[in-house]
Amino acid sequence: MPQSTLPKRQPQRRSQVPSSVLGSVTVGLEEFIQSQGAESQPVLSRAGLKPGLYQQPNRHISLKNYCNSMHEAARATGNEHFGLWFGEQFAPEGLGLFGYQAITSPTLRDAISGMEQWFHVFQRNSLLNFSSSGGICQ
């Protein structure tokens, strides 16, 4: 199996900057909240997010607030699996180049390797690792 010739990105020291994620993760969130029976604006507001973040897909938003939006949406809709259902219907293309790299990779290994390599662009102050040993991926 071909190995990447690019140097492996080393984890950076933990900084005082809060973890963040690209606003593209909110593509379709408002509509999905409403399709599950809740009003999106109050849900996002309680989570510390503003409506329309999907219109600025390259802007970083607080990861904590994004995770809170999943909890608030689950509570507001009564669907304890809200986050899973949102993720299931989310199109990877919505993640921009990060998602496009994953879906156009020739193998799953290449997709995960590319995601690991470029994760720091998509999500800041977070870590994603992938390793395989004896045919088992971790």
Predicted segments with their positions:
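N-terminal low-complexity or simple alpha-helical regulatory segments
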Residues: 1-138
